[in-house]
Amino acid sequence: MKNMTEGEPLKLIIPFMIPLLIGNVFQQLYNIADIIIVGRTIGVNALAAVGATAPLFMMLVILTLGMSGGFSVVTGQLFGAGDLDGVRRSAAMSTMLCTMFVIIMMAAAVMFIDPVLALMNIPPELYADAKSYVMIIVYGLIFMMAYNMLSNILRSLGDSKTPLYFLIVATLLNIVLALVFIINFGWGVPGSALALVVAQGFSGLLCIIYIAKKFPVLHVRLSDFKWDSRFAWEHIRMGLPMAVQFSVLGLGMIIIQAICNQFGSETIAAFTSAMRIEQLALQPMISFGLAMAVYTAQNFGARKFGRISRGVKKCSQLSLAFSLFAAVIMYFFGQEMIGIFLDNPSPKVMAEAKQYLHLSVPFYFFLSQIFIYRNSVQGMGISMIPMLSGVVELLLRSAAASYLTIDYGYTGECYASPIAWVGSSIFLFASYHYFLRLLARKNLGFKLK
């Protein structure tokens, strides 16, 4: 367990962030490995089938991350306040709520998968593989939620290293299983999805074993599972807006993908490859944001608001530096990375992947600030602002993708996300400073600098 309420903010945040960064990189490798194996062993259509439904898969991932991450904010605040009994009860409540949430998600997915895929304009030649991939992921949602919930709880108590170790193991297992299922067993795209589910289940099991042996504070009792509507609401108040916020972002990506799917398999493959490479480059900024959520949650629980202000300012500056570095790497070397996804990719795939990267990198500055301010406000318990920022992103991304593609085609599609980043970052920056000044006016023991 790590207390982040004492000491120099960056000296606490950076060591905490590094395991998160490595973990997030492996999380991306976890997903990229499937894309590479599918693309290089089966072909461009298989890669396009997985890529065409990638936003749907990411929607499921971020819903579980958002809900469990919101619940863990409550756990982190209780830990920061020194309420260890509350920490245990929070873990039990998170388990109950996450289980209910997974059941609802699975039922909704089974009922609406065909209409959703139809709305996404999945090409007929990709439909069977695309549907089988998504449904296998859906049936394994309980494993995805288990790992995300338990790893978020561990991080809320200051342990960011252990979830990393388990994720590394799961990533390696996923690669091995994907190769076996696809090459040896000939299961194709469904084999890739099954490998992912099995690896996620194994990482969740490792978390359970570790908590049982090393974290007595999380050894929940039967009495901890007693339903308390007020306590449940405290978790839902944080988890639901965060899940809605993430799902709104995911919906925006689904809309963009649906428009992209109209351009054919090669454009889908190009867009998928470029997005995967970009996500890898953005991980330092994402990791700083995740670290700030824990940092602000603990300091908010300890009523140390001045530390929140200092930490956010310093982390924002550092994240900006990383965004400039990532932009340079993606602009000059992004195209070379695209070749890992396909064996002998066509000139069109390479050109369109390069085009997306070159048009998006100038806007990484805005994206870096989104991660810092959104997670910081979330850690302070102001759950509606991150959700509203997601709505801003959805509206801007959808409008840009819909209207710009009419006149500019694929080029207009490439500008949709950057436009959304600009609008959302401005909204979050203004909201964070408004609420910080509100705390200062209430004479809560700190001054803005």
Model-derived regions: residue spans:
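Small-residue hotspots at the loop-to-helix junctions and early N-terminal turns
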Residues: 44-55, 130, 134, 193, ...
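Helix-terminus/linker motif at the lipid-water interface of multi-pass membrane proteins
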Residues: 25, 29-48, 117-124, 180-187, ...
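Transmembrane helical elements of multi-pass membrane transporters/channels
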Residues: 15-34, 136, 147, 170, ...
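Residue-level signal for short hydrophobic patches within transmembrane helices
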Residues: 6, 10-29, 33, 56-63, ...
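Short alpha-helical transmembrane segments in multi-pass integral membrane proteins
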Residues: 1-17, 75-140, 184-240, 296-362, ...
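Short runs within selected transmembrane alpha-helices of multi-pass transporters and secretion channels
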Residues: 68, 137-155, 163-171, 192-207, ...
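Small-residue-rich hydrophobic transmembrane alpha-helices
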Residues: 47-107, 144-163, 270-334, 367-389
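Generic alpha-helical transmembrane segments of integral inner-membrane proteins
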Residues: 21, 25, 29, 33, ...
